[in-house]
Amino acid sequence: MIEFSGRLGALKYPFFRRYWLGSFASVGATQLQVMALGWLLFELTESTLMLGYLGAAASIPTLAMTLFGGALADSIDKRKLMLGTSFLMTLLLAWLAVLDYLEIVTPWHIIVIAAAISFITGFDWPARTAIMPSLIERDEMFSAVALSAIVWQSSRMIVPALGGLILVVADTWVAFVLCTAGFFSMFLVMLSMNLKLPGLSSQGSPLEKVAEGVRFIWHEPTFLILTILSFAAMGFGFAYIQLMPAFSAILSLDESGYGFLISATGFGSVAGTLLIGDFQRSKNLGRLMLATALASCFFLYGFTVMTSILKHSDLAFAICIGCVFAASALNSMFMIMALTVLQLRVPEELRGRVLGIHGMCYSFGPLGGLAAGALAGYVTTSGAIAVLASCYVALIAFIALRYSVIRNLSGQTT
């Protein structure tokens, strides 16, 4: 029998292990869906603005519903909630696959289905995050957060490259069929788990429960600032991913090159996740978080310079791969450190709402893409990303200088 310890310690718990393996299927489906939707839409419209609209459709419903999704996750059985969300996303992606296969799909089909999936994600993400501590012991939280991050990051590393090959040898409808299978796999995993997770929240209306979670974050400086920084990390630091089809055109890349460029972000994130285990217990955890966030911005600047100056060259492509790799590694390190601090400090009865609010930050990548897409119409695609990176730098500098509660965070007391 395999014994798990250290960074893999959380895998010794059977329910977490099952949840983790199921997450590979559903998260892989999510990554493939994002890639295929963007490629299909750009193929139909050749418009960066439409990519921005797709980003808005993929983020705004999640932002609107996550607060209520967190309240629901605190009130009912989280496993049953995940059963429902997984099944609904399975149906939506199956519908999109049929539309695409029949060649009757339109840009607005893509936008509407992306918005519907985003709406459901507003309920799925809080449950997915809040259920995790129930599957492990507290002392394995660092391991569980890192392993969960590896699911997302390895999917970003592997799936786009495979997706690019799928687009070369088949079509986008094949990608949507695989996405359907991925979400259905997670549905089957949750169905197989004999686990009861009743809600713990107090009585009250949904709005009152949401307000309770918001008040907690507002009055706890550590939670408030780390949540703001997480939103900025995704909205400013990852906005470029939404515009990758446009950057691929700038670099004269085909489908496989597009896939490998996105995969570089996944490789970087996995590298950051593997490195973070050596720093989680650092007495300078707060300073380390700020430093990794700041350093990621300078690699974003490098990416924008290469796509502005060299453009159609193998050298530009190689340097861009290196820049997005490093930026993703550093941003991943920050996000894992921030989420672990929150997971360990949040009261159990507020977990769904507080982590749901934090989880809204993951929708800010596409929303940042909307802002970048709009800015690109006035400057350039590269210039738009540089502007967002500068906003991120300014925020990090302000927090580093103004808030000692973050600078002085220690992993030894978390």
Model-found features: residue ranges?
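Hydrophobic alpha-helical transmembrane segments
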Residues: P107-A114, S118, S143-S202, S263, ...
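C-terminal transmembrane bundle of multi-pass solute transporters/carriers
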Residues: L54, A64-F68, S75, L81, ...
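Flexible cytoplasmic inter-helical loops of multi-pass small-molecule transporters
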Residues: E140, L191-R215, L409-T413
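Substrate-agnostic recognition of the 12-TM MFS/MFS-like secondary transporter fold
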Residues: R18-V34, A58-A71, D77-L92, H109-V168, ...
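Juxtamembrane transmembrane-helix termini
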Residues: E43, L99-L102, T106-H109, L195-G199, ...
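Helix-loop boundary and gating motifs at the non-cytosolic
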Residues: I2-P61, F216-T265
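Cytosolic histidine kinase catalytic core of two-component systems
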Residues: F15, L49, D139-E140, W173, ...
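Transmembrane alpha-helix termini and helix-breaking/packing motifs in multi-pass membrane transporters
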Residues: G38-L44, A97-L102, I158-L178, I250-L251, ...
